[in-house]
From Swiss-Prot:
Encoding gene, per UniProt annotation: Aef1
Bias kind Low complexity: ranges: 56-76
Listed Pro residues bias regions: 81-90
UniProt record, GO biological process: regulation of transcription by RNA polymerase II
Protein name per Swiss-Prot or TrEMBL: Adult enhancer factor 1
Gene3D superfamilies reported for this sequence: Classic Zinc Finger (3.30.160.60)
GO CC terms of this entry: nucleus
PANTHER family for the chain: KRUEPPEL-LIKE TRANSCRIPTION FACTOR, ZINC FINGER PROTEIN 384
Protein backbone atom coordinates (compact mmCIF):
# COMPACT_ATOMS: atom_id res chain seq x y z
CA UNK A 1 0.00 0.00 0.00
CA UNK A 2 1.34 3.43 -0.97
CA UNK A 3 0.51 6.78 0.69
CA UNK A 4 0.18 9.69 -1.73
CA UNK A 5 -0.02 13.26 -0.34
CA UNK A 6 -1.17 15.09 -3.50
CA UNK A 7 -3.58 14.45 -6.33
CA UNK A 8 -0.99 14.76 -9.17
CA UNK A 9 1.20 12.18 -7.47
CA UNK A 10 -1.84 9.87 -7.26
CA UNK A 11 -2.45 9.96 -11.02
CA UNK A 12 1.21 9.39 -11.76
CA UNK A 13 1.32 6.43 -9.42
CA UNK A 14 -1.87 4.93 -10.89
CA UNK A 15 -0.41 4.80 -14.40
CA UNK A 16 2.88 3.34 -13.21
CA UNK A 17 1.62 0.73 -10.81
CA UNK A 18 -0.43 -2.36 -11.46
CA UNK A 19 -4.08 -2.72 -10.72
CA UNK A 20 -3.40 -4.89 -7.66
CA UNK A 21 -1.78 -1.96 -5.78
CA UNK A 22 -4.02 0.01 -3.40
CA UNK A 23 -3.61 3.80 -3.53
CA UNK A 24 -4.63 5.89 -0.48
CA UNK A 25 -4.74 9.72 -0.74
CA UNK A 26 -3.85 11.46 2.53
CA UNK A 27 -4.66 15.15 3.25
CA UNK A 28 -1.84 17.63 3.84
CA UNK A 29 -3.09 18.46 7.36
CA UNK A 30 -1.40 16.69 10.29
CA UNK A 31 -2.95 13.43 11.46
CA UNK A 32 -2.64 11.35 14.57
CA UNK A 33 -1.67 7.70 14.22
CA UNK A 34 -2.41 5.33 17.07
CA UNK A 35 -0.63 2.00 17.25
CA UNK A 36 -0.81 -0.69 19.92
CA UNK A 37 2.42 -2.53 20.57
CA UNK A 38 2.80 -5.01 23.50
CA UNK A 39 -0.18 -3.44 25.33
CA UNK A 40 1.64 -0.02 25.36
CA UNK A 41 -0.26 2.88 23.84
CA UNK A 42 1.85 5.41 21.93
CA UNK A 43 0.34 8.75 20.87
CA UNK A 44 2.07 10.69 18.14
CA UNK A 45 0.88 14.18 17.38
CA UNK A 46 2.06 16.08 14.35
CA UNK A 47 1.76 19.83 14.95
CA UNK A 48 2.33 22.75 12.64
CA UNK A 49 5.52 24.76 13.53
CA UNK A 50 3.71 28.14 13.62
CA UNK A 51 1.10 26.75 16.00
CA UNK A 52 3.80 25.43 18.33
CA UNK A 53 5.54 28.80 18.42
CA UNK A 54 2.28 30.57 19.29
CA UNK A 55 1.60 28.10 22.10
CA UNK A 56 5.07 28.60 23.55
CA UNK A 57 4.69 32.38 23.40
CA UNK A 58 1.34 32.19 25.21
CA UNK A 59 2.86 30.01 27.92
CA UNK A 60 5.68 32.51 28.44
CA UNK A 61 3.16 35.36 28.74
CA UNK A 62 1.18 33.43 31.33
CA UNK A 63 4.33 32.80 33.36
CA UNK A 64 5.25 36.50 33.25
CA UNK A 65 1.75 37.47 34.33
CA UNK A 66 1.88 35.06 37.24
CA UNK A 67 5.24 36.48 38.34
CA UNK A 68 3.91 40.04 38.18
CA UNK A 69 0.84 39.07 40.18
CA UNK A 70 3.05 37.41 42.79
CA UNK A 71 5.26 40.52 43.07
CA UNK A 72 2.22 42.77 43.51
CA UNK A 73 0.94 40.60 46.34
CA UNK A 74 4.33 40.81 48.08
CA UNK A 75 4.41 44.61 47.75
CA UNK A 76 0.89 44.96 49.16
CA UNK A 77 1.71 42.77 52.16
CA UNK A 78 5.02 44.56 52.97
CA UNK A 79 4.19 48.24 52.34
CA UNK A 80 1.25 50.59 53.11
CA UNK A 81 -1.72 50.44 50.77
CA UNK A 82 -1.51 52.90 47.91
CA UNK A 83 -3.27 53.48 44.65
CA UNK A 84 -1.19 51.66 41.99
CA UNK A 85 -0.61 53.35 38.63
CA UNK A 86 -2.54 52.03 35.65
CA UNK A 87 -0.64 48.98 34.29
CA UNK A 88 0.52 48.84 30.71
CA UNK A 89 -0.57 45.22 30.32
CA UNK A 90 -3.09 43.32 32.43
CA UNK A 91 -3.83 39.59 32.79
CA UNK A 92 -7.24 38.67 31.47
CA UNK A 93 -9.88 37.40 33.96
CA UNK A 94 -10.17 34.11 32.09
CA UNK A 95 -7.76 31.69 30.41
CA UNK A 96 -7.50 31.98 26.66
CA UNK A 97 -5.51 29.72 24.32
CA UNK A 98 -4.22 31.01 21.05
CA UNK A 99 -5.12 27.73 19.39
CA UNK A 100 -8.77 28.34 20.27
CA UNK A 101 -9.20 32.08 19.40
CA UNK A 102 -7.76 34.52 16.92
CA UNK A 103 -5.20 37.27 17.61
CA UNK A 104 -7.84 39.97 16.99
CA UNK A 105 -10.07 38.59 19.76
CA UNK A 106 -7.12 38.47 22.17
CA UNK A 107 -6.22 42.12 21.44
CA UNK A 108 -9.84 43.24 21.93
CA UNK A 109 -10.06 41.48 25.29
CA UNK A 110 -6.75 43.00 26.40
CA UNK A 111 -7.95 46.50 25.42
CA UNK A 112 -11.17 46.04 27.41
CA UNK A 113 -9.19 45.03 30.50
CA UNK A 114 -6.93 48.09 30.12
CA UNK A 115 -9.93 50.42 29.86
CA UNK A 116 -11.43 48.97 33.04
CA UNK A 117 -8.14 49.47 34.94
CA UNK A 118 -7.80 53.09 33.78
CA UNK A 119 -11.37 53.85 34.85
CA UNK A 120 -10.67 52.42 38.33
CA UNK A 121 -7.51 54.55 38.66
CA UNK A 122 -9.41 57.68 37.62
CA UNK A 123 -12.09 57.02 40.25
CA UNK A 124 -9.44 56.62 42.97
CA UNK A 125 -7.77 59.91 41.99
CA UNK A 126 -11.13 61.73 42.02
CA UNK A 127 -11.88 60.37 45.49
CA UNK A 128 -8.58 61.77 46.82
CA UNK A 129 -9.29 65.23 45.36
CA UNK A 130 -12.74 65.36 46.98
CA UNK A 131 -11.32 65.09 50.51
CA UNK A 132 -12.48 68.00 52.79
CA UNK A 133 -9.96 70.85 53.46
CA UNK A 134 -8.21 71.04 56.85
CA UNK A 135 -10.23 72.86 59.54
CA UNK A 136 -9.47 76.53 60.24
CA UNK A 137 -7.56 77.14 63.45
CA UNK A 138 -9.33 78.71 66.41
CA UNK A 139 -6.94 81.67 66.53
CA UNK A 140 -7.55 82.50 62.88
CA UNK A 141 -11.30 82.41 63.49
CA UNK A 142 -11.03 84.73 66.49
CA UNK A 143 -9.00 87.24 64.48
CA UNK A 144 -11.97 87.89 62.22
CA UNK A 145 -14.05 88.92 65.26
CA UNK A 146 -11.40 90.94 67.11
CA UNK A 147 -12.41 94.42 68.36
CA UNK A 148 -9.85 96.10 66.09
CA UNK A 149 -11.19 94.36 63.02
CA UNK A 150 -14.82 95.07 63.90
CA UNK A 151 -14.02 98.73 64.61
CA UNK A 152 -12.16 99.09 61.30
CA UNK A 153 -14.97 97.45 59.34
CA UNK A 154 -17.57 99.63 61.05
CA UNK A 155 -15.45 102.74 60.46
CA UNK A 156 -15.01 102.03 56.74
CA UNK A 157 -18.64 100.96 56.31
CA UNK A 158 -19.80 104.40 57.47
CA UNK A 159 -17.96 106.15 54.66
CA UNK A 160 -14.72 106.96 56.49
CA UNK A 161 -11.34 106.65 54.84
CA UNK A 162 -8.79 104.15 56.06
CA UNK A 163 -6.26 107.01 56.36
CA UNK A 164 -8.30 110.06 57.41
CA UNK A 165 -5.45 112.57 57.06
CA UNK A 166 -4.45 111.50 53.53
CA UNK A 167 -7.72 111.94 51.66
CA UNK A 168 -8.67 114.90 49.54
CA UNK A 169 -11.26 117.43 50.59
CA UNK A 170 -14.83 116.45 49.81
CA UNK A 171 -16.92 118.45 47.36
CA UNK A 172 -20.31 119.51 48.66
CA UNK A 173 -23.52 120.61 46.95
CA UNK A 174 -22.93 123.26 44.29
CA UNK A 175 -19.24 122.47 43.97
CA UNK A 176 -18.29 123.97 47.35
CA UNK A 177 -15.19 122.41 48.89
CA UNK A 178 -15.76 121.09 52.39
CA UNK A 179 -13.21 120.70 55.13
CA UNK A 180 -11.77 117.18 55.47
CA UNK A 181 -13.55 115.35 58.24
CA UNK A 182 -11.91 114.95 61.65
CA UNK A 183 -13.09 111.65 63.09
CA UNK A 184 -10.81 111.70 66.18
CA UNK A 185 -11.97 113.97 69.00
CA UNK A 186 -10.64 114.71 72.47
CA UNK A 187 -12.92 113.60 75.32
CA UNK A 188 -11.67 116.44 77.56
CA UNK A 189 -12.05 119.55 75.41
CA UNK A 190 -14.02 118.01 72.50
CA UNK A 191 -11.42 119.19 70.02
CA UNK A 192 -11.27 117.12 66.83
CA UNK A 193 -8.31 115.91 64.77
CA UNK A 194 -7.75 114.21 61.44
CA UNK A 195 -5.10 111.76 62.63
CA UNK A 196 -4.93 109.54 65.68
CA UNK A 197 -1.28 110.42 66.34
CA UNK A 198 -2.18 114.11 66.60
CA UNK A 199 -4.90 113.31 69.13
CA UNK A 200 -2.45 111.22 71.16
CA UNK A 201 -0.02 114.12 71.40
CA UNK A 202 -2.86 116.51 72.25
CA UNK A 203 -4.09 114.39 75.16
CA UNK A 204 -0.66 114.75 76.78
CA UNK A 205 -1.45 118.45 77.24
CA UNK A 206 -4.36 117.58 79.54
CA UNK A 207 -2.53 114.81 81.39
CA UNK A 208 0.73 116.78 81.69
CA UNK A 209 2.66 113.77 80.45
CA UNK A 210 6.16 114.49 79.13
CA UNK A 211 7.85 111.14 78.62
CA UNK A 212 10.86 112.41 76.62
CA UNK A 213 13.67 113.72 78.85
CA UNK A 214 16.90 115.47 77.95
CA UNK A 215 19.98 113.73 79.37
CA UNK A 216 21.89 117.02 79.63
CA UNK A 217 19.54 119.46 81.36
CA UNK A 218 16.77 117.02 82.47
CA UNK A 219 14.16 119.00 80.59
CA UNK A 220 11.14 116.94 79.51
CA UNK A 221 9.04 117.10 76.35
CA UNK A 222 5.80 115.65 75.07
CA UNK A 223 7.12 114.67 71.62
CA UNK A 224 10.33 112.95 70.57
CA UNK A 225 10.82 115.39 67.69
CA UNK A 226 10.87 118.30 70.14
CA UNK A 227 13.55 116.55 72.18
CA UNK A 228 15.62 115.96 69.04
CA UNK A 229 15.54 119.66 68.19
CA UNK A 230 16.35 120.57 71.80
CA UNK A 231 19.49 118.40 71.85
CA UNK A 232 20.91 120.46 69.00
CA UNK A 233 21.14 123.38 71.44
CA UNK A 234 23.62 121.45 73.59
CA UNK A 235 25.60 120.08 70.66
CA UNK A 236 25.59 123.37 68.75
CA UNK A 237 24.52 121.57 65.62
CA UNK A 238 22.96 123.74 62.92
CA UNK A 239 22.65 121.57 59.82
CA UNK A 240 20.33 123.88 57.84
CA UNK A 241 22.07 126.80 56.11
CA UNK A 242 20.58 129.65 54.10
CA UNK A 243 21.46 129.92 50.41
CA UNK A 244 21.20 133.73 50.47
CA UNK A 245 23.25 134.49 53.59
CA UNK A 246 25.76 132.58 55.78
CA UNK A 247 23.24 131.92 58.53
CA UNK A 248 22.66 128.39 59.85
CA UNK A 249 19.64 127.02 61.70
CA UNK A 250 18.87 124.02 63.86
CA UNK A 251 15.38 123.41 62.44
CA UNK A 252 14.18 123.27 58.87
CA UNK A 253 11.02 125.21 59.71
CA UNK A 254 13.12 128.07 61.07
CA UNK A 255 15.12 128.15 57.85
CA UNK A 256 11.92 128.19 55.79
CA UNK A 257 10.65 131.23 57.67
CA UNK A 258 14.04 132.95 57.31
CA UNK A 259 14.12 132.46 53.54
CA UNK A 260 10.86 134.41 53.28
CA UNK A 261 12.80 137.49 54.41
CA UNK A 262 14.95 137.29 51.29
CA UNK A 263 12.09 136.44 48.94
CA UNK A 264 9.63 138.92 50.48
CA UNK A 265 6.93 136.25 50.66
CA UNK A 266 4.10 136.92 53.12
CA UNK A 267 1.47 134.22 52.62
CA UNK A 268 -0.57 134.89 55.80
CA UNK A 269 -3.10 137.73 55.43
CA UNK A 270 -5.40 139.30 57.98
CA UNK A 271 -9.03 139.05 56.93
CA UNK A 272 -9.88 142.32 58.68
CA UNK A 273 -7.19 144.80 57.65
CA UNK A 274 -5.59 142.77 54.81
CA UNK A 275 -2.17 143.04 56.39
CA UNK A 276 0.22 140.24 55.45
CA UNK A 277 2.72 138.30 57.52
CA UNK A 278 5.43 135.71 56.94
CA UNK A 279 4.43 133.41 59.82
CA UNK A 280 1.07 132.16 61.01
CA UNK A 281 2.01 132.81 64.65
CA UNK A 282 2.58 136.49 63.86
CA UNK A 283 -0.85 136.64 62.21
CA UNK A 284 -2.50 135.08 65.27
CA UNK A 285 -0.94 137.68 67.53
CA UNK A 286 -2.06 140.43 65.15
CA UNK A 287 -5.68 139.25 65.18
CA UNK A 288 -5.78 139.73 68.94
CA UNK A 289 -5.44 143.46 68.34
CA UNK A 290 -8.71 143.55 66.46
CA UNK A 291 -10.39 141.45 69.12
CA UNK A 292 -9.23 143.75 71.91
CA UNK A 293 -10.60 146.75 70.00
CA UNK A 294 -14.08 145.25 70.21
CA UNK A 295 -13.86 144.52 73.91
CA UNK A 296 -15.07 147.49 75.94
CA UNK A 297 -16.32 148.19 79.47
CA UNK A 298 -19.46 150.32 79.77
CA UNK A 299 -18.75 153.35 81.97
CA UNK A 300 -21.60 155.46 83.34
CA UNK A 301 -20.82 159.17 83.40
CA UNK A 302 -22.45 161.15 86.17
CA UNK A 303 -24.39 164.26 85.15
CA UNK A 304 -25.90 167.14 87.01
CA UNK A 305 -29.32 165.56 86.85
CA UNK A 306 -28.02 162.47 88.60
CA UNK A 307 -26.43 164.56 91.35
CA UNK A 308 -29.60 166.58 91.89
Amino acid sequence: MMHIKSLPHAHAAATAMSSNCDIVIVAAQPQTTIANNNNNETVTQATHPAHMAAVQQQQQQQQQQQQQHHQQQQQQSSGPPSVPPPPTELPLPFQMHLSGISAEAHSAAQAAAMAAAQAAAAQAAAAEQQQPPPPTSHLTHLTTHSPTTIHSEHYLANGHSEHPGEGNAAVGVGGAVREPEKPFHCTVCDRRFRQLSTLTNHVKIHTGEKPYKCNVCDKTFRQSSTLTNHLKIHTGEKPYNCNFCPKHFRQLSTLANHVKIHTGEKPFECVICKKQFRQSSTLNNHIKIHVMDKVYVPVKIKTEEDEG
